[in-house]
Amino acid sequence: DDLHEDIRNIAYRYMFGGLGKKSSKGLEVFKNYKSSNSELDKLKMKEVEFYETYDKEGITDDAVKQSLVKFCDRYDKFEGRLTNQKYLMGDKLSLLDLAWFIYSYRLYVSGFPFRKLYPHVSNWFHDLYSQNEFYKEVNDPLILKLIRQYAKITTALNRRSIKALMPK
């Protein structure tokens, strides 16, 4: 999915509070491993580059802003669809709903202002989230909730919350 890196930017900044760094030794072993698949090796080097940059700079405000623009573009489309239908592909739950529920959950717990910007998406999300089957899948252990709260507080104090970095 073309938004994998973008959700990673949001999650690493707002959900994991600086956790998720790789040891330099482990990263070096991963970097030096060569497979017989050159395409896989290219993807691996992209991962290595991400973790090296993350170790030095964290997730930059510019990276978050670029990711938010991409998500807003997608949610603009979903908002229009959800004015006339219950789910993203129509009136029946689809794999698209399942995939976007996970993305939306990560953004929701990170402080994305769904209710203000995308009320139909917010209703769609909360309708799914209120169902036990969905809630059980994303209900994080207490330690992750505490880490997330720490990340939200520190980014808000530093004026680096999602709301502060949203595209104008």
Predicted regions and their residues:
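Long, positively charged, glycine-interspersed low-complexity recognition regions
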Residues: 117, 122-168
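GST-like fold's C-terminal all-alpha helical module
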Residues: 2-130
